[in-house]
Amino acid sequence: MRYAMFDLEVTVALRDLPLSSEDGGAAILVRRKSVPVAFWMQATNGEGCITATALAQKIAAEAGTRIIAEAIREELAVPAGCAAPSVTIAICTRDRPGGVTRLLNSLFERISSLPRDSPTPDVLVVDNAPSDDRTREVAGRYPTVRYVREPRAGLNFARNRAMKEARGEILAFLDDDVIPDRGWFEGLGAAWSSNCDAAAFTGQVLPLELETDAQIIFEKRGGFRRGFERIRLGPVFPGNSLYPGGAGNFGAGANMAFRTRVLEALGGFDEALDTGADVPGGGDLDIFYRIIRAGYPLVYEPRFMAFHEHRRDMDQLSRQYRRSWGLGFMCYLTKCLWTDPERRVNVARLIVWWFCHHTRDLLGHLKKRLRRQEHIPPSLLIGELWGGVVGLLGGYARSRRRVDEIRRQVP
């Protein structure tokens, strides 16, 4: 059963939240003066509504500290540390004209609300080895959108093409299955203005909808969420000896931005990661890792928020777990083993931890299944583990050979 989606503003009087007979639960985003401060999912057990009283108690428990912190931040507002940058927003896509249309409509709605003295964002659509002209036709409906075609198939080929075409001081990436929040520009601007030395920025990513079992399972396991506290990441992370190798520290590639000149100086994205169906993952984690290892700060800013359309069916979700989160992640770690001798022991420890953690997770959900408790389908977790095994056993080397062949065929 689906989860009803609610977007609440705490400075407005709370009301009962109505639920239909089709709603198995509710997903609630809480804001204070448009700033996101909390998100949670809760089962509703056939109830007709969530009362305002129950809602107030839940908000106090989940968001009370953040609401107070936001009120203090508002009172102690400090001047911007540096001028607003010019921004290129890149949409790398392949054969998804519907998603591109939705994203462009939402993006230009946000752009129209910017202050008149703000730099006008540069919007770039990178069409990655398309099978037809539908995306070019979509981009052509927007007079200010630039369209380029990247003939070499693979997301990181498209990202590197965006880097070469970028005109902005900041290059932001939005996937074609997201839409930006109304505070997206303000969030990016706030992160930049108080972290002028940072080279990368990531933001909160919440579900666009929770209509299917696959979407609900994905979000219950954590989705792409990273919390509602701004985090500035540097060379070390106190208490985490595996840093910066893990996946949970940085944010998601669906919504990220970089200082363009730093991205260029680092050589752009590794085209042997995020190569499409063969290795559909790891490319965002790799560039985050390399930025940190090069000595640049990375800032996670929850106000820099987007909404993601999760995979709708279980087959799609299974492929995501197996290939993106298993194979892609382990290919990224294998690369780190090869290329970063100084951190090799830590990366090896992370690989061991990953397999142990996911094995324990699988066993835990098998027990829940036997007890008829709510659980993640074991087949998803087995697929993720198997993807990790395939990635560890030469996945990155095979991908490099494939990419070399693509470069020979399409210079």
What annotation goes with each model-predicted range?
Residues 106, 124-136, 178:
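A conserved acidic beta->alpha catalytic loop
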Residues 171:
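Short aromatic/hydrophobic "clamp" motif used to bind/position activated sugar donors
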Residues 96-111, 115:
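Short, well-formed alpha-helical segments that are part of the catalytic scaffolds
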Residues 249-267, 272-304:
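A short, conserved alpha-helix in the catalytic core of glycosyltransferases
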Residues 183-223:
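Conserved donor NDP-sugar-binding/catalytic core segment of glycosyltransferases
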Residues 135-136, 150-166:
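Glycine-rich, basic loop-to-helix element that forms the pyrophosphate-binding segment
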Residues 221-248:
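Short, flexible, basic/aromatic active-site loop/helix in glycosyltransferases
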Residues 320-325, 341-411:
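Non-catalytic, C-terminal membrane-associated alpha-helical segments of glycosyltransferases
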